[in-house]
Each structure stands twice: as structure tokens, then as C-alpha cells.
Amino acid sequence: MSTYVFPDVAPEPVAPPRTAYLVASGDLRESANTAGWATQVELEHVVTAAFAEHGWDVVRANGVDPVTGHGFISSQRMGLEVFASIPPDAPLVVAEAVWQYSHHVLAGLRTHRGPVLTVANFAGDWPGLVGLLG
């Protein structure tokens, strides 16, 4: 007889009502992420304010890393870790203000069951829309 003990399965997180989760995929280059962070913060303020006007809260799925100084998801591994904490049926906002690599969030997006809204800035100096469409 086996003595193997199966691990407990953690319950899926559940989103509070009228709450959307926000993610932002970054670049592979930390210098690009650091340089574009202020523009990303501005975009996130606009998105959060628009949701608030309609009675919704927006929760950033991951915080700002004190070591890098930005809150971009900057690797596939990080993307998997961030998406593990997002309720799978929650509304999700993918907000992009700079160049980014979609593969950082692709695995999480593939398994996410809730609605997904993609938003980007349209500025000549920071190509969020180009990053989003690319």
C-alpha cells in the first residue's frame, strides 16, 4: 500500500462583485520597462477612473517590484505566477502603454474564463497600441 499523501487542492479565488483585475505585460529589457513605467501608471489611472465612473473597482494583479521599480509582468514565469492569483472568472483588463511581449501573459490568458478587455494608449512617444496589436 502506498503512503503517498495527495496535496490539498487550493480553492479557486473568487472576485468581489464589480471588480476587474488589471495586468500589464512588459518588455524583456528592464531598461525599457523602467523608462516606460510612468506612462503605464498614467494609462492605469485613466482606466481605473473610467471603471470607477461606472461603479467598478480595478485591482492590479501584481504590485510594483521594489527592486525593478515597475509593475510590468516581465517574464513568462512571472505571468504564470500572477495569473495564479487572479480569480479565473473575474473580468480582466490587459492595459498596455509601451512595447511588450505578449508571451508573458499568453498562458494566463489562454486559461482565463472571464471576460477580457484590452486597452492601450495611442501616443507617438510610447507605442502601447502598437504593442497591443503586435
Report the location of each language-model feature:
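Metallocofactor- and cofactor-centric catalytic cores in central/energy metabolism, strongly enriched
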Residues: M1-G134
